[in-house]
Amino acid sequence: MDATPNELSGLCTRLTAVEPAYGTVIAAVRLMWRTQGLRFTITGMENLPTTGGAVVAINHTGYIDFTFAGLPAYRRKPARLVRFMAKQEVFEHKITGPIMRSLRHIPVDRSSGAASFDAAVRALQAGELVGVYPEATISRSFELKEFKSGAARMAIAAEVPIIPHIVWGAQRIWTKDHPRKMWRPKVPIAIAVGEPIMPSLPPTELTALLRSRMQHLLEQVQDAYGPYPPGEFWVPHRLGGGAPTPAEAAELEVAELAERAAQRQQRGTGAGD
């Protein structure tokens, strides 16, 4: 299903009546999309349940792909909202914090993972759609990284399905190691929703199944999105692009984590002087 930002106007009005904060944010995002000249293609929307909780598992290629990941649920009839899990720092920010809380998103405190997990399970049991990134962090290669088991464990604990989602094209707008292209990027964004995966396996096996399904869905979306210009930063190495290979991306991530650790240690040392 092809969609333009203008087609969301009536939906925003209906959502604002039900959840004023969420509806207002969607209206603002819709305006941004229209200004950016984005074009959307959505497939598999029928795979989202019309009622009840579900884990929305999403690939992670850029900083704003979450704004697109909720679009299939918004356009579903009846329209539904996704409560995204996001790092605690976003909730502590003086601007984004109040917004995230008003939208009833779920903070992830890495020093207290159990509390975040429990909050997500409660939301799922209450019938919410909870958005999760199984890769945890952005993939510089734009291929799927190794998955954490959190999505599977949540689905098992809450006894709800996992709904795979692939967002493709968002990395062209804003991703790691590359400048933002927020002004009039005019790029196509593809969003695909896979068939529900029931939580009938142990966490390790369920996580492996989820990754396999998402890999297949990713390749389908990539094939439909092409052809790809050779050497472009946003195109995976496998498809002839300039993105790092998964191995190279893993090395960059290790270096990034080491640099962050060194900076934290330096700040701690400075505080004690």
Regions found by a protein language model. Give the residues of each.
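A short, flexible N-terminal coil/short beta segment enriched in small residues
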Residues: 1-13, 61-62, 71, 76
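Non-catalytic C-terminal accessory region of glycerolipid acyltransferases
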Residues: 2-9, 13-21, 114-273
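Alpha-helical membrane-targeting segments
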Residues: 13-39, 92-102, 177-186
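Helix-to-loop junction immediately C-terminal to a conserved catalytic motif
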Residues: 22, 29-60
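Short, basic, glycine/proline-bearing loop/turn elements
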Residues: 29, 101-107, 134-138
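Short, flexible loop segments at the rims of nucleotide/cofactor-binding pockets, characterized by
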Residues: 31-37, 107-111, 141
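Structural motif corresponding to alpha-helix initiation and N-cap regions
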Residues: 42, 93, 114-117
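Catalytic core of membrane glycerolipid acyltransferases/transacylases, capturing the structured
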Residues: 50-111
